């Protein structure tokens, strides 16, 4: 993939390439073990990843937690909690990501399977749109995070007394030593950068895979609409995998026994079943971490707004809170948006069937089509959480924002009293 002025030219047959920026970040952060190497090399890499996380994430979060021993009022709590909640949630998300890394790598390999290759001209558009969506999603979150970091690092310069970018407690006094202050300032800056990179690299893995699933659903819709119509022959694929060969063998058998049209309906049924299975796997891998992010975002957004509305807020603090708020709301909105898109696209299958030339179907093919239609009538919702289920859609996003504002109003009333 050639990158020219942030204008990538995608290869629709290499859909994994849309994650190249995420994989680059995860590789250097110790969260993407080499896939084609011996176990000893993987173990050394895993140890490297643990060392980074302990130094710049776990200890970093511990210094923020210890800050609570000096809090005096609600403003101090908000000042400490809005970043600490992000760190605690991130630690949980990364351990879940690290635990499921083999399954995540398998999902990215599955993304490049022959079944998901576009076969007709109309099928290229949804695949390429999904790839662009994954890339620009990463770019957007990365740039917003960069601006947030810049504001946080600059904000201490606007204060009369010496302070660090993030509220934290250290066993040394940095107020009277330039060297100690410089070392701690650098440590926090590295921690902020790494935490932000961890966040947008792992979160966009889930949303990116879901965008690709949505693109494949749209692809399936175009296949359904062409049933019964005269279409050009499928593009011949030079390289195919074992899964595709086995599926083609089954489809060719149906074509010889029951006819070409019945075989095409069978292909749509098998494709639909595979997409749903892939979606269930992605959902099962990430449901715990996404649920934690959604729940924590209510408190984080509330505390960020409370800090931004304080009396002694500088312009740099206000801009930092604004960009941080944009990052947090964007994370949750993206999760809810991709879930909403998948539900919306799957609900349109009845419409797709209506565009097919079903008048040409024989009795057996019509029965197969009815069976397929019954399969697609089942509602598809992306849900996260184990005991308490949260459906990812735009309604959920609005509820999160309303809940955050309600908590903010309660805290502001307590502060005024």
UniProtKB/Swiss-Prot annotation:
UniProt entry keywords in alphabetical sequence: Cell membrane, Glycoprotein, Membrane, Olfaction, Receptor, Sensory transduction, Transducer, Transmembrane, Transmembrane helix
Glycosylation-annotated residues: 112
Induction: Strong response to the odorant 4-methylphenol, a component of human sweat, when expressed in odorant receptor deficient Drosophila. In vivo, decreased expression in antennae after a blood meal.
Entry's Gene Ontology molecular function annotations: odorant binding; olfactory receptor activity
Keyword rRNA processing: no
Subcellular localization(s) per the UniProt record: Cell membrane
Residues annotated as transmembrane: 3-23, 46-66, 74-94, 134-154, 179-199, 285-305, 318-338
Residues on Cytoplasmic side: 1-2, 67-73, 155-178, 306-317
Membrane topology, record value: Multi-pass membrane protein
Topological domain ranges for the Extracellular compartment: 24-45, 95-133, 200-284, 339-417
One GO cellular component term: plasma membrane
Tissue specificity note: Female-specific antennae and maxillary palp expression.
GO biological process terms held by the UniProt record: detection of chemical stimulus involved in sensory perception of smell; olfactory behavior; sensory perception of smell; signal transduction
Function noted in UniProt: Odorant receptor which plays a critical role in the anthropophilic host-seeking behavior; establishes the host preference to transmit malaria. May participate in the phenomenon of decreased host-seeking behavior in disease vector mosquitoes after blood feeding.
Family: Belongs to the insect chemoreceptor superfamily. Heteromeric odorant receptor channel (TC 1.A.69) family. Or2a subfamily.
Protein name: Odorant receptor Or1
